Amino acid sequence: MKEYQITVLKGDGIGPEIVDQAIKVLNKTAEKFDFKVNYQEEYIGGAAIDATGEPLPQKTVDSCKASDAVILGAVGGPKWDSLSGSQRPEAGLLGIRGALGLYANLRPAVIF
């Protein structure tokens, strides 16, 4: 059975709620197509600021780089609007895109 490592970045605001549903869909897909998914949850955005004081902890970057895929939820919200640019939740999103060499959100789903 094929096995995949996925880093889960729930983000903040509505992100956790949406990501939880995406994981349910992925788990059903794994059952149907006979593959296994191992999840590693890390912080990004406002949730990371609240937990670690920074929008993109190095641990998150390292986990994403070691994974086969990343599930990313929404990032940002009024709670963090008073922070400076480099400390805002959105800095985590830009940082992870840069660290992974990405420039756009890709939404099509592919079964391997």
Ranges and model annotations:
Residues 1-13, 31, 36-38, 43-112:
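Anion-binding alpha/beta catalytic cores of soluble intermediary-metabolism enzymes, centered on
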Residues 14-19:
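Short N-terminal binding/cap micro-motifs at the start of the first secondary-structure element
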Residues 20-23, 76:
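Short, function-defining helix-loop hinge/capping sites that tune catalysis or transport
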Residues 23-33:
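Short catalytic helix/loop segments, enriched in acidic residues and glycine
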